Amino acid sequence: MAGMKRLFSRLVFLFAVSIAAAQLPTVEPPRAWKTAEGQAFQASVVSFDGTTVTLKMLNGARAQTVPAKLSAEDQAFLVEWQKKQPIKVVMPDSVGVDAAQIKAEVVSEDAVAEKYVYRTTHFEFESQGKFNQTLLREVARNFEATFELLKALPWGIGPKPASGEYFRAKLFKNREAYMAGGGLAGSGGVYKSRDEMFMVPFESIGVKLVGKSFAKDENFETHTLVHELTHQMMHFWMDYLPQWVVEGTAEYTGTLPLRTGNFRVSAAKNGLKDYIEFLKKRTTAGVPEPYPLEKLFPITNEQWNEVLADNPRASHQLYFTSYLLVYYFMHLDSKGDGQLMARYFREVGSVRKGAEKFGKEMEDFKKQPGVTVHPDGSFTYRSNLTLPKPPAEIATPEAQAAFQKKTLQILLDGRSEAELMKQIRSAYTKLGIRL
């Protein structure tokens, strides 16, 4: 026992006299550890919160220490161990805004220039047509409800404008004006990340001219609006997510039941079935065959866009399968609590935060004496200055691809693409949906 005391003199031992087993996480088998000084011992991890690790020694005692007192290899092990631990996922039942609290103000109106600017708490949107008060409040409510939804879902998005105080949008009076303003051919709306702008023609959301102002018509719908706003809310995530996650999350939010400014997340299954019925009744191709996962998971943005341009049938498959995957990981996989999805976004989020820090370091670097920023955005600097380094995961296109492949393993959870697809088909069959 004296040798044990010498060996672990730097650890603080906590002897648990009576601890309910149900309160503790599953203890893993013992493994070999080393202190920072190189002393070896055997123990199992009981818990690690990122600051303090609790170990179970071979004699049953519990010991607490900080990672810095362990070897570099053991510190790396703890980081990976923590990533694998369950997250307490809180799935919201209903998310929305109180209509009475909605701020929807007129900033400016210019009938000659067809430019009407409106502002809500988090959005500023420019319309080519004047909105009546009912439509203005409805649009404002849906914009703000989408913001609240992205805050509440267990993805840790933390939506904020790409720049400035407000998310920006442009609404066009018809498709011709939409295309002339930079809209995407064949689309019902688009979020252009380079311009930080959501663009949509009135017809895509069911708005028509009534007298001298625009109002809702019988086809008023929110799917396109919510889909593209989701992209806008996730502006700072899009560079770190594969395209199937980018589009799948937007399809998922766009299908959630939305009534009077409230998304019913608990009724996501109703949205799923409505989506399937829409495909059956209102599209010529019907319900698409799922896109092969072994092709979908590694697809690049360039390859995705090539499919959209050249193959309408495969395009439908891409969006449909992306939605199926996100819905599955949110509601059907394992216990149906979105656990793997939350862990996936936590891992991606850690790198995104590192990239955000790098971006700020670069901004500060460019302000230093000896750095010259050119009109095209490029810059030169003196050789005695040290350029900030980006996170290794995003340093090169190859590193980014490797990072996406690594984080995919969180969702696969030891399954092959074929095994996952088999489980997906089985889960949807139980809902009455045959794929």
Enumerate the language-model features and the residues they cover.
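N-terminal secretory signal peptides that target proteins for export/translocation
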Residues: 1-7
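Bacterial N-terminal signal peptides
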Residues: 9-21
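Compositionally biased alpha-helical segments
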Residues: 22-157, 181, 188, 276-279
